From Swiss-Prot:
Keywords: ATP-binding, Chaperone, Cytoplasm, Isomerase, Nucleotide-binding. One of its GO terms (biological process) is protein refolding. It comes from Synechococcus sp. (strain CC9605). Belongs to the chaperonin (HSP60) family. The keyword Isomerase applies. Pfam families: Cpn60_TCP1. It is found in: Cytoplasm. GO terms for cellular component: cytoplasm. InterPro entries: Chaperonin_Cpn60_CS, Cpn60/GroEL, Cpn60/GroEL/TCP-1, GroEL-like_apical_dom_sf, GROEL-like_equatorial_sf, TCP-1-like_intermed_sf. This is Chaperonin GroEL 2. Forms a cylinder of 14 subunits composed of two heptameric rings stacked back-to-back. Interacts with the co-chaperonin GroES. It catalyses: ATP + H2O + a folded polypeptide = ADP + phosphate + an unfolded polypeptide. It comes from the Bacteria.
Length: 544
């Protein structure tokens, strides 16, 4: 296919145009008074959402070069989402501000490579400062505050996530389900999560989120490698007759067997997914036995004289729901309390008997996975559109609270970044010189961008608010919901340090890449052939 090649300033300006379009669409959602965005869908009802990364993923522009700019900033948002699960809008606004200021300097003759070095050094300095400022989470009240802010100031959501964390522990699993009523409810049930995702992405049932969700599935547990699909055929035929989905958890699945499963899944013959068993050696077997107890099934192992080809339906485990993504598998089971309790007692006995610290640690891990259970939040809403929006907000809130537990909290509402701007300017003036100093100052100027946007979305003057906040000490910032200047920590307006840090690092990384671009190679738009004239109507000049 023919390519179009654009150089120098033209290339950077085209990228900038795409970045402007994406940033404007995403930035309207920022802050407590941020608005929603409606996404038109080819099939089904339109979606109304308030989540930066979801909006960014939907934007595709006609111009290939501008679309490249969109894709670059989208990457900053999705990387922040992968790392921290929230803060995607902040990352987008920061990257946009850095790119705008940086391009002005490059156009004025600054060396892009040296600017990038300055940006990277400034980013490293700020990351260390954010870590210093972070305060560890003290109680469930702080968890509720983080959840509330992340869910768009929804206190009910914040409180529910704090309750869920109380019940399943800070390391526990919180899963989301679509509820049947108008109310959002919390339920704690047996279940576990382990760090293995699907073997093939073709098993995903939701291609937008790249997740496989199986409702009321059968679970086949085996500690052997599945090499031939013939071994599976008898059990697959039995399951196909029931019409229920199947999850296979095995040591591994060879290519031939995997290909057969994928083909059956794509043709709709059988809704199946496969996951590698977690752990190694004896520990893997023990974890598979834990899963068998949890799901009321049997581990098919040759040690017990069981073979795959002789497996019956009653040997398989069952669960209420299983969610699998590329990295993790979450099993939500129910109705097995007695068996799970007995298994937990057995693990505790083993812990008492062993002298090895390593073994004790691993047994403790297994116990926590099995006994902790899963908190299921059933999302309630009046309409499907509201349900989808609420689900995205809840997901952000859960991710934000987990990030806060990991790395602590900092004052929210763009306050932390705005307060760091003067500190960065001082450090850069004493430690850097020339164009590196200009690069660091580009970052310093961009740090107030999220705060300004939050203020503007609330109807205030962004530049005035930013100057006022920079002049204040400690954790004082602008509460956009009330329009007052308050102590953000005392008012419960907090952000997870991990979210702020990830957003900043990804924005600086993308900005550096855009500034150092000197040439773009993109596909030429395809010329569409004119449609042939209608039968018997000739190709005249008239519109019939």
């Amino acid at each position: 296919m023919a390519k179009r090649i654009i150089y120098n300033e033209n290339a950077r300006r085209a990228l900038e145009k795409g970045i402007d379009i994406l940033c404007e669409a995403v930035a309207v959602t920022l802050g407590p008074k941020g608005r929603n965005v409606v996404l038109e869908k080819k099939f089904g009802a339109p979606q109304i959402i308030n989540d930066g990364v979801t909006i960014a993923k939907e934007i595709e522009l006609e111009d290939h070069i501008e679309n490249t700019g969109v894709a670059l900033i989208r990457q900053a948002a999705s990387k922040t989402n992968d790392a921290a699960g929230d803060g995607t809008t902040t990352a987008t606004v920061l990257a946009h501000a850095m790119v705008k200021a940086g391009l002005r300097n490059v156009a004025a003759g600054a060396n892009a490579i040296t600017l990038k070095k300055g940006i990277d050094k400034a980013s490293d300095f700020l990351v260390s400062k954010i870590k210093e400022m972070a305060k560890p989470i003290a109680d469930s009240n702080a968890i509720a505050q983080v959840g509330t802010i992340s869910a768009g100031n929804d206190e009910e959501v914040g409180k529910m996530i704090a309750d869920a964390m109380d019940k399943v522990g800070k390391e526990g699993v919180i899963s989301l389900e679509e509820g049947k009523s108008m109310e959002t409810e919390l339920e704690v049930t047996e279940g576990m999560r382990f760090d293995k995702g699907y073997i093939s992405p073709y098993f995903a049932t939701d291609t937008e989120r790249m997740e496989a969700v199986l409702d009321e599935p059968y679970i086949l547990l085996t500690d052997k490698k599945i090499g031939l699909v013939q071994d599976l055929v008898p059990v697959l035929e039995q399951i196909a007759r029931t019409g229920k989905p199947l999850l296979i958890i095995a040591e591994d699945i060879e290519k031939e067997a995997l290909a057969t499963l994928v083909v059956n899944r794509l043709r709709g013959v059988l809704n199946v997914a496969a996951v590698k068993a977690p752990g190694f050696g004896d520990r893997r077997k023990a974890m598979l036995e834990d899963m068998a107890v949890l799901t009321n099934g049997q581990l098919i192992t040759e040690d017990a004289g069981l073979k795959l080809e002789n497996a019956k339906l009653e040997m398989l485990g069952t669960a209420r729901r299983i969610t699998i993504n590329k990295d993790t598998t979450t099993i939500v089971a129910e109705g097995n309390e007695a068996a799970v309790g007995a298994r937990c007692e057995q693990i505790k006995k083993q812990m008492d008997e062993t002298d090895s610290t390593y073994d004790k640690e691993k047994l403790q891990e297994r116990l926590a996975k099995l006994a902790g259970g899963v908190a299921v939040v059933k999302v309630g809403a009046a309409t499907e559109t509201e349900m989808k929006d609420k689900k995205l907000r809840l997901e952000d809130a859960i991710n934000a609270t987990k990030a806060a537990v990991e790395e602590g909290i900092v004052p929210g509402g763009g306050t932390t970044l705005a307060h760091l701007a003067p500190a960065l300017e001082q450090w850069a003036a004493s430690s850097l010189s020339g164009e590196e100093l200009i690069g660091a100052n580009i970052v310093a100027a961009a740090l107030t961008a999220p705060l300004m946007r939050i203020a503007e979305n609330a109807g205030a003057n962004g530049a005035v608010v930013a100057e006022n906040v920079k002049a204040r000490a400690g954790a004082e910032g602008f509460n956009a919901a009330s329009g007052e200047y308050v102590d953000m920590l005392a008012a419960g307006i907090v952000d997870p340090a991990k979210v702020t840090r990830s957003g900043l690092q990804n924005a600086a990384s993308i900005a550096g890449m855009v500034l150092t671009t000197e040439c773009i190679v993109a596909d030429l738009p395809e010329k569409k052939e004119a449609a042939p004239a209608g039968g018997g109507m000739g190709g005249g000049d008239f519109d019939y």
